[in-house]
């Protein structure tokens, strides 16, 4: 039985990857921070009683900023594969916590590589390093491939740049089977709530259910290459099954503006959103509702509030400059030719399928809150 160690197992990618590897017969070890004690909802369905003798999912406390902890954990687990997915990955927040991001995302990767080397596991353990399309930042060519020069535009991206090159360095210097997956934006129903796609699907769901009047966005013209996380974790697995380690761009090759993502997400539940104005004065309005689709996917009881919003021409989407980054990344679109040719990887979800999956999940999630509110219970404040 193969043994895998996943850092960041409580995150979106870690949860999907853990489930995928368990189905393949792996013994999966996951590293989680103490602060993630109450943040295990993504893997709760995989939980196994720690008193069982033959369980194949084991969780360990750990942190990428603690080299002794990492070394001890790798020595104890003796993994065949390490998937380093843990990171402080919110770009906007990285400008506020640059030192921590450098320590965790940059030096944390070095700590894993050095632990494997010092423990004499170079021949045994293969390492996957989660790199990011944010490395390209101020893009030097379109689309971006493995050969495109990097130009990071945030503390997060700079930290990941160090992690990328130290992985390459250890591969070349010590003959490690260590590879980078340069993953472009990948989303899902369990995406972090403050990431732009999930922010949109959550807010639109609440608007449709009459629980929220409007929501605020940053740069609506930013373009991203969005795929489904379920597809992307399969690429991670395939990368470590190759005889020769290398670096791969994982992307769909299609880019979409945030504005168009909002329009597509609204359309999924029968709403037409039109944008008027430019820059910080740009606003989005619901102008039409397809009653058949809305009733099917949201519910007839919520229709009257949407019709009222259309009649009043109330804005639903507004721009708030506080969500702009100090240095913007305007266009990301990946060239997945290498991963498709060598790995045989091809995404199963297109953007429409991704949006459908996310909207269906968030409508279901917030209907629960709507029922609680109607029953007189207090619900969480989701405004940002």
What are these regions (language model features)?
Residues 1-188, 230, 236, 240, ...:
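N-terminal Rossmann-like NAD(P)+-binding domain of SDR-like oxidoreductases, especially those catalyzing
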Residues 42, 139-143, 153-155, 161, ...:
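NAD(P)-dependent short-chain dehydrogenase/reductase
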Residues 3, 214, 245-247:
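Residue-level preference for the first positions of well-ordered beta-strands
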Residues 278-282, 289, 295, 310, ...:
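Flexible, low-complexity inter-domain linkers and amphipathic docking helices that mediate domain-domain
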Residues 216-218, 249-251, 318-320:
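Solvent-exposed beta-strand sheet faces enriched in polar/charged residues
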Residues 232, 236, 250, 261, ...:
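Non-catalytic, hydrophobic alpha-helical segments
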């Amino acid at each position: 039985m193969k043994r895998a160690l996943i850092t960041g197992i409580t995150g979106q990618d870690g949860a999907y990857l853990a489930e995928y590897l368990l189905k393949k017969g792996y013994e999966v070890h996951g590293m989680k921070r103490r602060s993630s004690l109450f943040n295990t909802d993504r893997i709760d369905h995989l939980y196994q009683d720690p008193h069982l003798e033959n369980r194949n999912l084991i969780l360990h406390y750990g942190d990428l900023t603690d080299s002794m902890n990492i070394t001890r954990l790798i020595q104890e687990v003796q993994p065949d594969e390490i998937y380093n997915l843990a990171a402080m990955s919110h770009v906007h927040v990285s400008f506020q916590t640059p030192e921590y991001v450098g320590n965790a995302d940059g030096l944390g990767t070095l700590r894993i590589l050095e632990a494997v080397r010092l423990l004499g596991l170079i021949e045994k353990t293969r390492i996957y390093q989660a790199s990011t399309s944010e490395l390209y930042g101020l893009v030097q060519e379109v689309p971006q491939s493995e050969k495109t020069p990097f130009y990071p535009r945030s503390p997060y991206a700079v930290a990941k740049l160090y992690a990328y090159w130290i992985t390459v360095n250890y591969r070349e210097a010590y003959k490690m089977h260590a590879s980078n997956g340069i993953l472009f934006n990948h989303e899902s129903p369990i995406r972090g709530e403050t990431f732009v796609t999930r922010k949109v699907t959550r807010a639109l769901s609440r608007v449709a259910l009459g629980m929220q009047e409007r929501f605020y966005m940053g740069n609506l013209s930013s373009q991203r290459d969005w795929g489904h996380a379920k597809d992307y974790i399969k690429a991670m697995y395939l990368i470590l099954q190759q005889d020769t380690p290398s670096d791969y761009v994982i992307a769909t090759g299609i880019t979409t503006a945030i504005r168009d993502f909002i329009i597509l997400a609204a359309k999924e539940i029968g709403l037409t959103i039109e944008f008027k104005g430019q820059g910080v004065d740009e606003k989005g309005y619901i102008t039409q509702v397809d009653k058949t689709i809305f009733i099917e996917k949201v519910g007839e009881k919520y229709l009257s509030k949407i019709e009222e919003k259309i009649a009043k021409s109330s804005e639903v989407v507004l721009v708030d400059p506080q969500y702009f980054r100090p240095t913007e990344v305007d266009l990301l679109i990946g060239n997945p030719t290498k991963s498709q040719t060598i790995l045989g990887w091809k995404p199963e979800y297109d953007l429409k399928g991704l949006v459908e999956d996310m909207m269906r999940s968030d409508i279901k999630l917030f209907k629960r809150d709507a029922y609680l509110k109607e029953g007189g219970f207090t619900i969480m404040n989701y405004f940002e």
